[in-house]
Amino acid sequence: MIKRSSNLENQVIQSENFSKKSLENHVFNSCSFNSCDFSESLLRNAHFGTCIFTNCNLSLPKLDGCRFQEVRFVDCKIVGAEFFKCEKTFFSPKFENCLLHYCNFSDLNMKKVSFSGSKLKECHFTNTNLISADFGEVDLSGTVFHNCDLSLADFASAVRYDIDPQTNKIKKARFSLPEAVGLLRGFGVTIV
């Protein structure tokens, strides 16, 4: 079990239940979290550096001031996470085959982020820097992009996205048909 105000390094944490528990001000460096439950956990001002979360549940975590620096999430369920409340300076996550539902990534610098193989359902991106982001094999059902920089982002194998080129920068972003037709919705165009 992790003690109060812990500073852990190079640890493998397996099947731990942190649900509704506080990890406030804890520091984790080069740690692996496998099959852990962080639902509704308090991660205020916690620091995760070069950590990997595999098959973890992060539903409704409290992320005020939390730092995710060079962190990978693999096969995780992340619901209702307000990532915009995280420490913005060092925010550098990578998501692989994750379920991200109702998450908010507004006002973040997510340049070169990868969401590879993930499902982003009704997530929110406003004023987000997503230059060179990888949305490979990503389902973006109901996800909103507003005033984002999507330049050089790769949506070529993404599905169910609805991006308005009038409110987002999409210069040199990659799209493919038939999904790219969604780029015309904001213009009131009818395609037959």
Describe every region a protein language model picked out.
Residues 1-192:
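Tandem repeat scaffolds
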